[in-house]
């Protein structure tokens, strides 16, 4: 089984702008540009606000327990349904979790995590 990773990095504004400038030059020159997939934050504080211990626990629980609904996830974690729903919506916007609605009698939204590891990269 192949391990799937997601990259999370801290990239300072200057480095981000320099990389964007370099990419634009390559595009203008007609060169092929490889797509870099990942989640980037400007600083460690921003990353900590996004990936709180509760949200990391939520990702782990989704991956390990594979709940069939948001309600089931909230019960597994002994957390309030509203808070779990808000955290899932936030993590979905960051592309860290996927929510797929089912077409059963009762509409369910099973969350899923499609990677095995989060790799953190911090430039010095």
Annotated model-derived regions:
Residues 1-28:
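General nucleic-acid-binding
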